[in-house]
Amino acid sequence: MKGEYEAVARAGVDLQIDCPDLGMGRHIQFADLSLDEFRKMARLHIEALNHALANVPPERSRLHVCWGNYEGPHHHDVALGDIIDVLFTARPSGLSVEASNPRHAHEWRLFERVKLPPGKVLIPGVLDSTTNFIEHPDLVAERIGRYANLVGRENVVAGTDCGFGTWVGQAAVDPDIAWAKLASMAEGARRATREFF
């Protein structure tokens, strides 16, 4: 994919690399490994990714860590705190993480003790992409604010937990609801901007 990644960047488009292997891979593909063995595997995957992105400017790319975009228990998900140091070694400057679903919504507190490396931008999911609830703009602003207070307002970009149509024929969120959720995110971001800028 190295050539394709470079072509995308040359065309002036920012590149997002989706990496379910670094999140969901823990409980789907690598469940038999110890945490240390999984971290070693994750480091190997990031090493390969960094090679593929060697000629793509870090600020033109972001890494999305996905724990599986499905409505399920997620009680075997690897904790963000168990892999954050490994994720920070990835070349992309943007790091997109699930931060709204009930299994990962608490992980913003990780950044009370973990510092975002210079040059990195955090893209927390402020919308749960698996439910038809439309988040209130004030909740979106609150979620953005939690991260802005911890990593700096200039280092936060609002995102969604994942995409709204991950698998063909298995749309958990009605398309009209997805658009309404995105409108709520835009309004919540405006409110957070007024508060922090």
For each predicted feature, which ranges?
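Domain-level signal for soluble alpha/beta catalytic cores
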Residues: 1-197
